[in-house]
């Protein structure tokens, strides 16, 4: 007998959570795909971090980019493993397959949907697609509970559906802090390579796509008064436009390129302030990474990871208010104490990974 966990692919920012669900809840970990083809990830490095052997589901792929899948062995896995708990990927076809099996064969196992809805999506009717909106209305009442990344969304689901467990996308700081320490030599090289010695650094990490609101972010930088360098780590379809836009604002912006693993961690060590200006962001796992690295964070109120921000570790901004964003960045830059030496800063997360996982496991088992 084994509990079952289904998800589209292994994501680096969720591996610690996946490991905990495997070890603490006895889940067989099943995935549609080996990795997320839309992102440039270190697939081999992710596999090494897994404390489980992933099972990749057989089936028929369809949809744009073949990102969707009709999994042909779901009922076989349910029948052979006799689970008490089945965790499914929000409102996908597989979720319907699991629910049909439960209802047709009158099974008693608990179906829990892991859902990445942000508060902006549910509260402001700002779903990515109309299909997702209607799938929520259909499926949310049928599952037994929901694992939700944003505490505000948990409260919304509790109000509308009487269900919801808060499980933010967070890494285990016990593992991550030594990784930041290991990355310090790379951080020192960055300071030399990009002429950052003696300068305060504002950092963005992510894809250069419309949802990240980077055009408005760059325009807001043009309104700031403090002296700092902005480093943009990532790549994407809008890079050319953003480079052109940055030439006319009178502020220094470094387009550093795409990095993974220790290459990204080293940038968090260099940074003084982190920013996520997205206008549409289901979560934003980079916020957790920045906070563990000790970076005061200026985060869009539209991002799910806004739930990680307190008065002690950052501030929230309206992604459409350029003056407000500029003011928040200036205030953050005045607040932080810059050290020209590269050191690992104090963890600014408002809670510990184990505390969240222990609470989630307890609620799932109830």
PLM regions and their residue ranges:
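A short, histidine- and acid-enriched strand-loop-helix "catalytic/donor-clamping" loop
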Residues: 94, 109-129, 144-145
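Donor nucleotide-sugar binding/catalytic pocket of nucleotide-sugar-dependent glycosyltransferases
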Residues: 136-186, 196
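Conserved donor-binding/catalytic core segment of Leloir-type glycosyltransferases
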Residues: 185, 191, 196-212, 218-221
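Nucleotide-activated donor-binding/catalytic signature segment of Leloir-type glycosyltransferases, i.e.
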Residues: 243-259
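Short alpha-helical donor nucleotide-sugar binding micro-motif in glycosyltransferases
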Residues: 258-259, 266-271
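Aromatic "clamp/platform" in nucleotide-sugar-dependent glycosyltransferases that forms part
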Residues: 279
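Short hydrophobic beta-strand element within catalytic cores of glycosyltransferases
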Residues: 292, 296-299
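Conserved acidic donor-binding segment of nucleotide-sugar-dependent glycosyltransferases
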Residues: 311, 315-322, 331-337
């Amino acid at each position: 007998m084994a509990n079952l966990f289904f998800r589209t692919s292994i994501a680096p920012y969720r591996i610690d959570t996946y490991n905990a669900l495997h070890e603490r809840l006895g889940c067989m970990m099943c995935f549609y795909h080996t990795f997320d083809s839309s992102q440039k990830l270190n697939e081999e490095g992710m596999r090494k971090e897994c404390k489980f052997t992933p099972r990749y589901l057989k089936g028929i792929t369809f949809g744009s980019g073949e990102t969707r899948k009709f999994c042909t062995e779901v009922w076989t896995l349910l029948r052979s493993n006799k689970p008490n708990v089945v965790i499914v990927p929000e409102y996908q076809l597989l979720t319907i397959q699991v629910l049909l099996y439960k209802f047709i064969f009158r099974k008693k196992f608990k179906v829990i949907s892991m859902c990445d809805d942000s508060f902006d999506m549910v509260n402001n009717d700002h779903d990515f697609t109309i299909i997702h909106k209607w799938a929520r209305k259909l499926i949310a009442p049928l599952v037994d509970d929901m694992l939700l990344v944003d505490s505000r969304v948990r409260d919304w689901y509790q109000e509308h559906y009487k269900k919801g467990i808060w499980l933010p996308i967070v890494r285990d700081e016990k593992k991550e802090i030594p990784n930041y320490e290991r990355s310090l030599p790379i951080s020192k090289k960055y300071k030399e390579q990009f002429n950052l010695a003696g300068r305060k650094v504002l950092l963005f990490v992510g894809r250069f796509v419309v949802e990240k609101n980077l055009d408005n972010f760059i325009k807001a930088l043009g309104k700031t008064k403090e002296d700092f360098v902005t480093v943009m780590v990532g790549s994407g379809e809008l890079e050319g436009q953003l480079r052109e836009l940055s030439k006319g604002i009178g502020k220094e912006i470094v387009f550093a390129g795409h990095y993974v693993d220790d290459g990204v961690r080293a940038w968090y060590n260099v940074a003084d302030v982190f920013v996520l200006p997205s206008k549409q962001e289901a979560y934003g796992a980079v916020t957790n990474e920045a906070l563990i690295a000790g970076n005061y964070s200026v985060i869009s109120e539209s991002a799910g990871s806004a739930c990680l921000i307190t008065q002690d570790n950052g501030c929230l901004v309206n992604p459409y208010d350029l003056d407000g964003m500029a003011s928040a960045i200036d205030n953050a830059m005045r607040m932080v104490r810059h050290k020209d030496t590269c050191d690992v800063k104090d963890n600014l997360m408002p809670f510990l990974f184990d505390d969240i996982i222990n609470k989630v496991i307890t609620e799932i088992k109830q």
